[in-house]
Amino acid sequence: PDIVPVFMSGYSDKEYLKAAIKLKAVNYIEKPLNPVEIRDAIMEARDLCLEKKRTRQNASIHSMESASRLALLLTQPFAHAKESIDQLIAELSLSISNTTPFTAIVLKTDTEEELPLSEANAMFLSVREFLKTFHIDCIFAEKRVQYMVYFLFGSTPGAAVRKSIEEFFCNLYSRCTRFCIAAGDTVTGISRAYQSY
């Protein structure tokens, strides 16, 4: 977790100081306690926590953008973008091999307006969370405003799992707009993901 320790000790003990250093404490305050020193240490700890949170959020946004670029690349034949695809897979640390099953799901919405980014991201994250129960991961891209393209990969979904996934997508998108949904055949390997699309 993102914590920033501040040590306050009633003893001038070298072992406490070593422990504080090992735990990367922001400050080590000894008796007699000085309220100004405590306040400054807490403010510094707060600032460090906020910075860690911002860094984590920026990394998450960058990761989602990279995953979206990968999904867009998979909507074209593999040979056209092999190097970029390989680079993005490595950057995202995805466990994809030439035997990984891929299934494309395309939703065509009945809107001319782009979904707000926060809403599209929230929907993607809820899809991803839902799929975890089936040991399936996904990447997502919005294409030409009306098309939501998901590439599911990981375990091969059986008929019951496909039905559950289909129902989940229908429930998720029915709250927003009218839409059509289509799922491609499950194919083996990222080089064939385009064929599912």
Name each model feature, range by range:
Residues 2-3, 168:
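A broadly used, surface-exposed interaction patch
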Residues 3, 138, 176-179:
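A structural micro-motif
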Residues 3-4, 26-28:
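Conserved phosphoryl-transfer motifs of two-component systems
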Residues 13-16:
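Alpha4-beta5-alpha5 switch/output surface of CheY-like receiver
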Residues 21, 25-27, 33-164, 183-195:
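Interdomain helical linkers/hinges and coiled-coil/dimerization scaffolds
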Residues 160-176:
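Alpha-helical scaffold within the catalytic cores of cyclic-nucleotide enzymes
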